[in-house]
Amino acid sequence: MRVEERLLKYVSYWTTSDEECRQIPSSERQFELGKVLEQELRDLGLEKVTLTDHCYVYGLQPATKGYADKPAVGFISHMDTAPDFSGKDVKPQIIPDYDGNDVLLKGSGAYLKVSDFPTLKTLKGRTLITTDGTTLLGADDKAGVSEIMTAVEQIITEKIPHGDIWIGFTPDEEVGSGADLFDLDYFKARFAYTVDGDYEGEVAYENFNAASASFEINGVNVHPGEAKDIMINAALVGCEIASLLPENETPAHTEGREGFYHLTDFSGDIAHAKVNYIVRDHDKATFEKRLDTLRGIEKKMNEKYHADTVKLNIQHSYSNMLEVIEKNEYVVAIAKKAIKNVGLEPVSRPVRGGTDGARLSFMGLPCPNLGTGGYGFHGPFEHISVEGMDTAVSVIKEIVKITAE
């Protein structure tokens, strides 16, 4: 099956994860795609194929005879799509020989604009796949799933010699728990790659350190006519907290390795309010200073008003995998050689986010991230080219060949 055929098939399944649910999977609908992938792996003849009770799919393509001593490599993608935008009833638009201009998204009437996504110019002449503007596409990360499945099929049909190849498809990556129940006792790769990036030829091995932070604010509500020196307006305290953070250290004002505080939700009234942030930085020391800044705000507010007015809860999300990859540089070297073998120069940029691979790296499985050829993830302007997906398939195959040398 062609890689784009797989993508169009997989995006027809609604697999949006639910950030309000703490179970894994966070949405039962992810099992529908999991069942399809389980069967496809069985149909390809893989061994140790299983779909777990928590919606993880695993499979093993055993080593070619005489190659059992070669290192076992793994490839991992996630089945869920981001809850940021609808992933239900996806209606892809397929544009052969794309002309390099703005694209009308016929369902919404919006345009995918070259001015907003300059990389569109590099896709001129290719077959472009977009949304119709009413949903996201789901290339994040069903493109990765499609590319892994297609690469495995081609490795088998082309009789490419290889060591053990482990395949893993996870739920709930988009809500930060995709690696929580990943079974490394079952998935016996020495190293692996998530296929969950964007640029063709990308191998990413540096990501944010990440945490979520929640300020719970308890106010004092009395009649406004008798409120002097008594009332504490929790909503106003929340505004004050937001004002104490640097206004130029938000996602809209930062790039590259610059970190940020991101206000994700603010709700409440006079009696009670809640202010939620995510905190990100590539540098570990700077990241810890950011968390200390939040703790300082909590202390300041409780000193200004009264004890227990503000309670801060910080939850660690993931760490920068660079700390692990620096001790396992061969994993990146293999990927870069594979990318060069398909005629591209490797692209390695700091990821302004995280992947399952970041968590897995700290669990003992070095796991950089490979590009899928997709862009504009998490919204209606998501798009990908067939040729970019073909390139990702080729990179996976080259990694397998190099690992078997």
What annotation goes with each model-predicted range?
Residues 10-11, 269-271, 346-399:
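Zn-dependent metallopeptidase/amidohydrolase metal-coordination segment
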Residues 236-253, 260-262, 309, 319-371:
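Active-site-adjacent substrate-binding region
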Residues 153-175, 256:
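Short helix-loop-beta-strand segments that form the rim/entrance of peptidase-like active sites
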